[in-house]
């Protein structure tokens, strides 16, 4: 019925306190070799399901706010394009678009959906200089660790034209 030993509760009240003491953290699950261990593994294994859940989401209001800041026909980088939903929207509105994603499976499906090549590339591999009037990184940069943000921010800034827009 009841356990013979009392349950142990975490002595830390906040997440911040817990992460400040990683040596005392309790591991609830173990990553087995058959389970997804990285974000890219997850997207590669679940690409079709991800696309099904995101392709029809209407981002028109946000996309238009971004486009309103750009010159007509500007070059846009869809940085972590996922399904290609936003890439296609920008193309249909007369913009030139380069699209990248780290997931090979998403790249293949997004390329098929958008009709343009989608480059399989990690954020840290962006190596462009003053090419883009806008970089669209919608729901993408959240996949980076804190330690990766400086390098990727530098690469984004370098890839943008002067006065370029990042979303």
Question: Which ranges hold each PLM region?
Answer:
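A short glycine-rich, Lys/Arg-flanked "PGG" loop and its adjoining helix->strand segment in the class I
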Residues: 150-162
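Conserved beta-strand signature within the Rossmann-like core of class I S-adenosyl-L-methionine
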Residues: 163-167
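N-terminal auxiliary segments of SAM/dcSAM-dependent transferases
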Residues: 12-19, 26-34
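A short acidic, Gly/Pro-enriched loop at the edge of an enzyme's catalytic core
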Residues: 124-135
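Class I SAM-dependent methyltransferase SAM/SAH-binding core
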Residues: 83-125
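A short SAM/SAH-binding and catalytic strip from SAM-dependent methyltransferases
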Residues: 133-148
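Conserved class I S-adenosyl-L-methionine
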Residues: 28-71, 73-82
């Amino acid at each position: 019925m009841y356990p013979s030993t009392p349950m142990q509760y975490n002595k830390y009240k906040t997440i911040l306190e817990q992460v400040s003491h990683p040596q005392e953290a309790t591991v609830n699950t173990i990553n087995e070799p058959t389970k997804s261990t990285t974000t890219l593994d997850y997207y590669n294994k679940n690409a079709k399901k991800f696309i099904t859940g995101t392709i029809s989401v209407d981002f028109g209001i946000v996309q238009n706010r971004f486009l309103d800041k750009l010159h007509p026909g500007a070059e846009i980088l869809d940085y972590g394009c996922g399904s290609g939903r936003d890439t296609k929207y920008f193309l249909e509105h007369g913009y030139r678009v380069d699209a990248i994603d780290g997931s090979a499976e998403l790249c293949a499906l997004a390329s098929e959906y958008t009709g343009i090549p989608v480059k399989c590339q990690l954020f840290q591999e962006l190596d462009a200089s003053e090419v883009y009037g806008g970089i669209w990184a919608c729901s993408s940069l959240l996949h980076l660790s804190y330690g990766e943000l400086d390098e990727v921010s530098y690469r984004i800034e370098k890839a943008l034209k002067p006065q370029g827009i990042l979303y």
